[in-house]
Amino acid sequence: ILSLLSIRVSDIIRLYADLTGGDQGLAHKILADLGISEDFLKSKKLHELSAGQTKAVCTAIALSTRAKHILLDEPFEQLDPARKNKLIRYLTEYDGIIILNTHETWLIKNLIHWKTFFMFEGSLYGPILVEELLNAKFSFQEEAKALMKLVISGKTISLISEGHGKPILSLESLDKIYELALEAEKS
């Protein structure tokens, strides 16, 4: 494993393609779209990349394996908005099941046909279709007609489609829900 750290990124991409029967060309196409050239990858080792470049390389490798299922951990982290939009296109075109986690709520409007789960404090809630979430709001009280009820910091928060609440898409990050729950508790 230590010897893998000393090889060039382009060789790591080739290795994964060989091991998985993946498409090395697709990995390079995705990375080129994200502004990372093949020549650059031939000149760098993985530890020499920025956090965003490393995230892009790992995501491109995963997508290029064409596996039936892939798991992406925060694939948008450290990417600028333009690169995030390009990556979304590859995710929506992927012919397989993608499980990804993110805190960024603005992304969901681009993943309209996806199922969504929420995880707060180790508890998993869902599924709920993204199209149901687009106009949904967080209500900081128990609502009888809630789409979903979440328990966050010991408080029940309802996800509602009608009524007063904080629109999900108005939150930059789902982490903000903790701050809002605390504010609601004080009022």
Q: What does each of the following model-derived ranges do?
A:
Residues 1-52:
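ABC-family P-loop ATPase nucleotide-binding domains
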Residues 59:
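Hydrophobic anchor residue at the start of the ABC signature
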Residues 63-68:
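A short, proline-enriched helix->beta-strand linker immediately N-terminal to the Walker B motif
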Residues 76-77:
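Short loop immediately C-terminal to the Walker-B catalytic DE motif
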Residues 90-103:
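Conserved catalytic loops of ABC-family nucleotide-binding domains
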Residues 104-111:
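Conserved H-loop
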Residues 123-150, 164-168:
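Conserved beta-strand-loop-alpha-helix hinge in the C-terminal portion
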Residues 144-187:
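C-terminal coupling/interaction segments
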